[in-house]
């Protein structure tokens, strides 16, 4: 982890995981405001997730840092490809958000899925998932990471997860909107939620 703050976050996540999964509720949670002052390329605020130095692999086999997603808003969720119920609904919710944007705005928003399953969700497995779900390459990014990096990112996103003995994951369902600098500006918690406010947030971010 890169800072004492991250270490504290991860400790809290570990202690509270089981209770938090049991108590999760399906409500929307929004963080204030969205539009930050533009920064020079490669520089991020202290609230930006793009400060994380970990390296990820896309389903196309490209190695990237999260900062390479900067420049336009991102709709981000964590999942695993073998998930039979929750994750497909989460992806569908993201597709609902995508479809609700006007075509000219849709092209200015990215959609990112990050796998919990470092062991099984190889780039090839993620590429197959993309084909199965018909996720356009020009807008959607699918990421595989090492287990420690996944844990760090999950903590920063407020996503709680735990692998069971069968290789399945119990996890919270959170769709996060990041602004162009990688700051969290909205989180939609739970499945099948009303997407209106999330769409409005994205419209503001891209300057409708």
What are these regions (language model features)?
Residues 1-57, 205-208:
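N-terminal targeting signals for export/organelle localization
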Residues 51-52, 74, 172-174:
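Short loop/turn microsegments at loop-to-beta-strand junctions
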Residues 66-94:
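Short active-site neighborhood of thiol/selenol oxidoreductases, capturing the structured segment around
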Residues 69-71, 80-81, 114-119, 135, ...:
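Solvent-exposed coil/turn segments that connect beta secondary-structure elements
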Residues 73, 98-105, 133, 154-157, ...:
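Sec/Tat-exported extracytoplasmic proteins
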Residues 91-153:
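Structural microenvironment flanking redox-active thiols in thiol-disulfide oxidoreductases
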Residues 139-140, 151, 157-163, 170-175:
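Structural micro-motif
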Residues 164-208:
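Thiol-/selenol-based redox modules, centered on thioredoxin-like
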């Amino acid at each position: 982890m890169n800072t004492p703050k991250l270490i504290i976050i991860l400790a809290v996540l570990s202690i509270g995981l089981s209770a938090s999964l049991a108590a999760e509720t399906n409500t929307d949670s929004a963080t204030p405001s969205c539009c930050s002052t533009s920064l020079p390329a490669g520089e991020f605020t202290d609230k930006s997730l793009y400060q994380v130095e970990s390296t990820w692999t896309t389903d196309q086999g490209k190695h990237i840092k999260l900062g390479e997603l900067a420049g336009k808003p991102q709709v981000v969720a964590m999942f695993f490809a073998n998930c039979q119920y929750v994750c497909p609904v989460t992806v569908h919710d993201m597709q609902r958000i995508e479809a609700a944007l006007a075509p000219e705005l849709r092209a200015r928003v990215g959609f990112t899925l990050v796998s919990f399953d470092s062991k099984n969700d190889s780039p090839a497995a993620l590429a197959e998932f993309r084909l199965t779900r018909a996720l356009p390459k020009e807008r959607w990014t699918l990421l595989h990471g090492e287990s420690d990096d996944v844990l760090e990112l999950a903590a920063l996103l407020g996503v709680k997860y735990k692998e069971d003995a069968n290789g399945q994951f119990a996890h919270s369902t959170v769709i996060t909107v990041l602004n162009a600098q990688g700051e969290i500006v909205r989180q939609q918690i739970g499945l099948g939620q009303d997407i209106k406010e999330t769409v409005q947030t994205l419209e503001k971010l891209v300057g409708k």
